[in-house]
Amino acid sequence: MSGSTGERPFSDIVTSIRYWVIHSITIPMLFIAGWLFVSTGLAYDVFGTPRPDQYFTQERQELPIISDRYKASQQIQEFNK
């Protein structure tokens, strides 16, 4: 016979009203926070990725592909011009 860890069974937690009161608020808030994080553009600033309209400029319409791994930093500087 296995010992008890003293934790509540998962079925008791999921069927409790307190669980659903807390999670009916927090789960939708997580989705709203994620949507705001992306829709305001903060995700682009935090992770340093270019916005969709910054991938191709008027001067550069080709794909910015690194072809030489040893001169990668030089190629990136050329792409950013």
UniProtKB/Swiss-Prot annotation:
User: Which parts pass through the membrane?
Assistant: 21-35
Predominant cellular place of this UniProt entry's protein: membrane
Q: Which domain of life is it from?
A: Bacteria
| Annotated Pfam families | Cytochrom_B559, Cytochrom_B559a
Cofactor annotation: heme b
A single GO molecular function term of this UniProt record: iron ion binding
What GO biological process term is on the record, naming one? photosynthetic electron transport chain
Instruction: Explain how, and how many, cofactor molecules are bound.
Output: With its partner (PsbF) binds heme. PSII binds additional chlorophylls, carotenoids and specific lipids.
Its membrane topology is listed as:
Single-pass membrane protein
Q: What positions does the entry give for heme binding?
A: 23
**Sorted alphabetically, which InterPro entries does this protein's record hold?**
PSII_cyt_b559_asu, PSII_cyt_b559_asu_sf, PSII_cyt_b559_CS, PSII_cyt_b559_N, PSII_cytb559_asu_lum
This protein's UniProt keywords: Electron transport, Heme, Iron, Membrane, Metal-binding, Photosynthesis, Photosystem II, Thylakoid, Transmembrane, Transmembrane helix, Transport
A GO cellular component entry from the record: photosystem II reaction center
Per UniProt, subcellular location reads as:
Cellular thylakoid membrane
Q: How does it assemble?
A: Heterodimer of an alpha subunit and a beta subunit. PSII is composed of 1 copy each of membrane proteins PsbA, PsbB, PsbC, PsbD, PsbE, PsbF, PsbH, PsbI, PsbJ, PsbK, PsbL, PsbM, PsbT, PsbX, PsbY, PsbZ, Psb30/Ycf12, peripheral proteins PsbO, CyanoQ (PsbQ), PsbU, PsbV and a large number of cofactors. It forms dimeric complexes.
Q: Which family does it belong to?
A: Belongs to the PsbE/PsbF family.
Protein function: This b-type cytochrome is tightly associated with the reaction center of photosystem II (PSII). PSII is a light-driven water:plastoquinone oxidoreductase that uses light energy to abstract electrons from H(2)O, generating O(2) and a proton gradient subsequently used for ATP formation. It consists of a core antenna complex that captures photons, and an electron transfer chain that converts photonic excitation into a charge separation.
Query: What name does the UniProt record give this protein?
Result: Cytochrome b559 subunit alpha
Protein species of origin: Rippkaea orientalis (strain PCC 8801 / RF-1) (Cyanothece sp. (strain PCC 8801))
Organism lineage string: Bacteria, Bacillati, Cyanobacteriota, Cyanophyceae, Oscillatoriophycideae
